[in-house]
Amino acid sequence: MICVSVQEKSFGDCRAILESCEMAELRADLCRLSVEEVERLVEIRPNLIATCRIANSSEAFAREQLEAAIRRGARYVDIEIEAPDEHLEYIRTLAREYGCRLIVSFHDFEGTPSLDELKGIARLCRTKGADLVKIVTTARN
């Protein structure tokens, strides 16, 4: 299965992509959709990962977008490991209540940590309540 990252600016473009794929990551922080539009997109493709990075938006905006996706039936929600604990706790609790699986993710756009560091990161993600751990690193050679 291929997961498509949806980052389009218009609802219509997002909808067209979601209707043509098996699974998608809806980047609400990059799409800038209304809550109602997020809800409608989740109805089209519930088998998606709802993502809204605080670094690209605000905690309040991220909470609003993720809450809408979870309540409407998104299968997964992705929270970055650096998110404030109270934000992560709120989203984790809501996700559990609605049967949504929590992905806690780590990103390193500069390189790849050592294997021991990666194992430690995975453990930390699990202690934060992750159902799934996502680690993204950057290869340099």
Annotated model-derived regions:
Residues 20-22, 63-79, 119-134:
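Structural recognition of alpha->loop->beta junctions
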